[in-house]
Amino acid sequence: MASFMRSLFSDHSRYVESFRRFLNNSTEHQCMQEFMDKKLPGIIARIGETKAEIKILSIGGGAGEIDLQILSKVQAQYPGICINNEVVEPNAEQIVKYKELVAKTSNMENIKFAWHKETSSEYQKRVVEEDEEPPKWDFIHMIQMLYYVKDIPATLKFFHGLLAANAKILIILVSGTSGWEKLWKKYGFRLPRDDLCQYVTSSDLAQILDDLGIKYECYDLLSTMDITDCFIDGNENGDLLWDFLTETCNFIKTAPLDLKEEIMKDLQEPEFSVKKEGKVLFNNNLSFIVVEANV
């Protein structure tokens, strides 16, 4: 690995912009919307049974777009029931955006919001240190955030222990069938790493849950990321997408020529992408893992 390559996470503003470009060029949120519309109602069908209040914990809620979709489904399932929605999110900018989104969204009257600017591990530490009994939750969701957890088995075990009767955890992350799995396995050791992020897919998560003896169901949904601009020399959008794909700041400018050529060639191969109507569509398949409370 060339010493002048550095992690994308070392430049916060560039990371935020590259992530925005990823969302704009992928079907990520549409894929999540499809799951929320078709699968989520059945998953949450019993979480609020006989309860005067439904408690929801969002780990890594970001700017709240998907959180509000989830809340609308819970409201539809349990009309009039008070919902207590707590958000654990380490990024202050994202919390501001989340609050702005709530402020301009209608039908939020029966939902109480609380935001905690902290990581999931900081939340765990705070809960453990408090003398009172840890709170129980009816629904916990972790959307595209397990990559930023150092000890995934311990994290899953902890939050599984916070589930109330009939409660569920929803975890969303990239599928083991996605191009990400192949990209990380083949090139991860040649790209700059830092402690903030690790490579994990649904295949890894299934093994962890099996080892912990935790019951779960997994749903895979198709998603793509349009990386056509990545193959246009000097294209700003393409350069930012390269940064997101490789988690490398200014990948095109700083990566060794041989590495760039190899990845560029591979990402156009069928195991990574499909070519359709002149576009190169990277396999961004997502997995939705639903974890159940102990009976």
From Swiss-Prot:
Pfam families the record matches: Methyltransf_23
Protein's UniProt name: Histamine N-methyltransferase
Reaction(s) this enzyme catalyzes, per UniProt: histamine + S-adenosyl-L-methionine = N(tau)-methylhistamine + S-adenosyl-L-homocysteine + H(+)
Sequence positions that bind substrate: E28, N284
GO BP terms in the entry: histamine catabolic process; histamine metabolic process; hyperosmotic response; methylation; response to amine; response to cocaine; response to glucocorticoid; response to immobilization stress
Gene: Hnmt
Subcellular location: Cytoplasm
Subunit description: Monomer.
Record-annotated disulphide pairs: none
Positions contributing to S-adenosyl-L-methionine binding: G60, E89, Q94, S120, I143
UniProt function note: Inactivates histamine by N-methylation. Plays an important role in degrading histamine and in regulating the airway response to histamine.
Keyword S-adenosyl-L-methionine belongs to the record: yes
The entry's keywords: Cytoplasm, Methyltransferase, S-adenosyl-L-methionine, Transferase
Gene3D superfamilies from the UniProt entry: Vaccinia Virus protein VP39
Molecular function via GO: histamine N-methyltransferase activity; N-methyltransferase activity; selenol Se-methyltransferase activity
Predominant localisation class: cytoplasm
